[in-house]
């Protein structure tokens, strides 16, 4: 869906971090209702159940959740393959590990940097996510959200509706 909202005489374009979960779908819907051009982006780290199942020789029973979500929204998903670049993040996270030994804050910074690069290369204005304040004990608390915004290089260009 193309938006009609204009900024300085041109269409406003947003990159939507689409995980396939309800929060990112709702965030995309809010942007679309504001007549903002939305490009859904999914950064593939390779560390998913789908990858595990493929490596085990099991065929996927359905398209990945981000693909299903984009289709439901009537949008074409952009997938960024970042597996190799992601390995150092999980081996030595600057901000430590989350409760399940996952590098929550570092992961968010990494994903948003990948999306920021795509955003800049494709002349989009900002990025939005489906993050919810205090929904996760490490990465979605106000101080962590501020660190992620700053260290991803998206100060003033990251919206969490």
Q: Model regions: which residues?
A:
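ATP-dependent adenylation/nucleotidyltransferase module used to activate substrates
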Residues: 1-161
């Amino acid at each position: 869906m193309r938006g009609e909202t204009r900024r300085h005489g041109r269409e406003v374009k947003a990159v939507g971090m689409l995980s396939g979960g309800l929060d990112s779908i709702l965030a995309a819907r809010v942007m679309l209702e504001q007549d903002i051009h939305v490009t859904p982006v999914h950064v593939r780290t390779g560390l998913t159940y789908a990858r595990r199942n493929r490596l085990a020789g099991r065929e996927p029973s359905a398209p990945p959740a981000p693909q299903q979500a984009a289709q439901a929204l009537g949008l074409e998903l952009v997938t960024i393959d970042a597996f190799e670049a992601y390995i150092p993040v999980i081996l030595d996270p600057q901000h430590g590990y989350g409760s399940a030994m996952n590098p929550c804050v570092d992961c968010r910074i990494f994903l948003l940097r990948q999306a920021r690069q795509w955003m800049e290369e494709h002349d989009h204005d900002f990025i939005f996510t489906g993050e919810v304040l205090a929904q996760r004990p490490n990465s979605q608390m106000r101080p962590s959200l501020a660190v992620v915004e700053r260290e991803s290089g998206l100060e003033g260009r990251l919206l969490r509706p």
